[in-house]
Amino acid sequence: MADKKGSNSEKLLYCSFCGKSQHEVKKLIAGPSVFICDECIDLCNEIIRDEAAGAGIEAGLSKSDLPSPQEIREILDQYVIGQERAKKILAVAVYNHYKRLKHLDKKDEIELSKSNILLIGPTGSGKTLLAQTLARLLNVPFVIADATTLTEAGYVGEDVENIIQKLLQNCNYEVDKAQRGIVYIDEIDKISRKSDNPSITRDVSGEGVQQALLKLVEGTMASVPPQGGRKHPNQDFIQVDTTNILFICGGAFDGLEKVIVDRTEKTGIGFGASVKSKQDRDAGEVLREVEPEDLIKFGLIPELIGRLPVVATLGKLDEVALMKILVEPKNALVKQYHKLFNMERVELEIRPAALQAVARKAIRRKTGARGLRSILEQALLDVMYDLPQMKGISKVIIDDNVIDGDGKPLLIYEDAPKVAGSN
């Protein structure tokens, strides 16, 4: 079916796979007595990518060259700026977890227990990005869950087993892959116990959720309805063993530093005790001294803390770190905007003073790295709106006055070396 004669005796060429003619497709590529169209090539590439991704999950966990902690750390460095101690702790914990999974089949008297991870740090310090980067590096299924939307089973809200359902969806309901995935539970501090004293009213979004999460984190058979349906008494459920799923919990834990300071000040009384005022210690330095008893006092139940043995604390990002985040990572925001402007065949220049202004604004807003994109988006909105309709522009320059809202981007035109403000 490679070629046929048309009515006007023109020789029509056809795709040997889908049968479409050369007039129905954008491109037809010839081989030895066969032709393939661009649509079939795209379909083949998609099939190869899907199969390679599936094989990669299995291969990534079974092959002998599992990345070492140093290699994991180096890859994290490419995407996450700062937080050196947290990256080191995570690299070791993740390496040990997947090394443990590789040796599960070997009979041994010593059984290695799972080390789930607790990340403590302010908003925008990189907790979610660290977890996402780890999952991408190891090529395993990954899901982010928001603890604030969870409630106990039987109450309005999300059941904790919905987390496993989302993980299954992310790997096309392949149970074996899901059972070796990574789950990141954000805002874990928001489900802390509301009071130290037991109450007659049930706390369905606090301690109750912690109890439900406890079973999931330590390892249980979760019953998940097939293909995202609702739970129904007469249907068959997919059984997922959560024993080997790595759980990473993250939260800002606002107020935890006060709990730590109160404890350390009590224990640091007497002759020879080193005294350091609260003003001399930043929040990151205080959080590094966190102990299980501090987390219990904050409102987490002891059983859940016991299932999160690896604790990594992240510090607040300063101006220098935020400026580096804008330009240094592989997928840095400035690189992304450069690419967007290049698509319009326009060069974008964001001057160092502008980067500094963006970082300062994010610090004032207390949004950390998470707020950088919205600041840049706001500054570039007008020029991105007008640019597709404007002719002859070769370069756009952003200075600090644009970020602060006191000026407009500078436009440089191709035909003349003049600089003009955008309208």
From Swiss-Prot:
Keywords attached to this entry: ATP-binding, Chaperone, Metal-binding, Nucleotide-binding, Zinc
Q: Which SUPFAM superfamilies match?
A: Glucocorticoid receptor-like (DNA-binding domain) (SSF57716), P-loop containing nucleoside triphosphate hydrolases (SSF52540)
Q: Which InterPro entries match?
A: AAA+_ATPase (IPR003593), ATP-dep_Clp_protease_ClpX (IPR050052), ATPase_AAA_core (IPR003959), Clp_ATPase_C (IPR019489), Clp_protease_ATP-bd_su_ClpX (IPR004487), ClpX_bact (IPR046425), P-loop_NTPase (IPR027417), Znf_CppX_C4 (IPR010603)
Q: Where does Zn(2+) bind?
A: 15, 18, 37, 40
GO MF annotations in UniProt: ATP binding; ATP hydrolysis activity; ATP-dependent protein folding chaperone; protein dimerization activity; unfolded protein binding; zinc ion binding
Question: Which Pfam families does the UniProt record give?
Answer: AAA_2, ClpB_D2-small, zf-C4_ClpX
Q: Which residues form the ClpX-type ZB domain?
A: 3-56
According to its UniProt entry, one GO biological process term is: proteolysis involved in protein catabolic process
The residues that the entry says bind ATP are 122-129
GO CC annotations on file = HslUV protease complex
Q: Which family does it belong to?
A: Belongs to the ClpX chaperone family.
Q: How does it assemble?
A: Component of the ClpX-ClpP complex. Forms a hexameric ring that, in the presence of ATP, binds to fourteen ClpP subunits assembled into a disk-like structure with a central cavity, resembling the structure of eukaryotic proteasomes.
Which HAMAP family did the record assign?
ClpX
Q: What is this protein called?
A: ATP-dependent Clp protease ATP-binding subunit ClpX
| Source species taxonomy | Bacteria, Pseudomonadati, Pseudomonadota, Betaproteobacteria, Burkholderiales
What gene codes for this chain? clpX
